[in-house]
Design a protein with these regions (language model features):
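RNA-contacting regions in translation and RNA-metabolism proteins
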Residues: 1-196
Length: 196
């Protein structure tokens, strides 16, 4: 989903979209250990202020000792994109990381890259989500599973994941794991309940 909250003139749109992409890529590469579930970017109507809100499972890693890491991110982003714009970075803690598809995907990637058997990883991820209160979860892994010659797709679903119901709160994430055998694609669908 798009997590950019701003409008612009037609001619400025590509540049602002590229700025958003630069911000997201930089923050994700700089702070992989912080467990970032989403990055929201909003701008005011005159494009004079950029507000970046980072939702993190481990905000203390993102902020760093005495705010050092966050200050480094701020200064680099200021040089890269802010041409006269005021940049504000907010960090919000994700209270339940096991109910975020993005973080579940990161956990699966981390385990698969450590060469843990894929079926065990999927079952563990599903169990963690169900304990956290998810009503349903579906996880799919595709590629050379356990180093097999022929690539295949495997998935496990527990509970219900209604993808056709509009009021269903379904969180989705797509990840890639770079293993010694090649690239594995991971998809996570997490059903948190219905929005009334």
């Amino acid at each position: 989903t798009h997590r950019s909250f701003w409008f612009s003139k037609f001619k400025d749109y590509p540049q602002l979209l590229q700025e958003d992409s630069i911000i997201r890529e930089f923050i994700n590469t700089k702070s992989q250990a912080a467990g970032i579930s989403k990055i929201e970017i909003s701008r005011d109507s005159y494009n004079a202020q950029i507000i970046v809100t980072i939702h993190s499972a481990r905000p203390e890693v993102l902020v760093g000792k005495d705010g050092l890491t966050l200050n480094q991110i701020y200064s680099v982003l200021n040089k890269k994109i802010a041409n006269g714009q005021k940049l504000t970075i907010n960090v919000q803690e994700v209270l339940n990381p096991d109910l975020q598809a993005e973080l579940i995907g990161d956990f699966i990637v981390e385990q698969l890259e450590k060469r843990v058997a894929f079926r065990r990883v999927l079952k563990l991820a599903i169990a963690r989500a169900r304990v956290a209160g998810a009503e349903g979860i579906k996880v799919q892994v595709a590629g050379r599973l356990n180093g097999a010659e022929i690539a295949r797709t495997a998935w496990i679903r527990e509970g219900r994941v209604p993808l056709q119901t509009l009021r269903a709160d379904v969180d989705y994430a797509s990840k890639r794991a770079n293993t010694t055998y090649g690239v594995l694609g991971i998809k996570v669908w997490l059903f948190r309940g219905e929005i009334v």
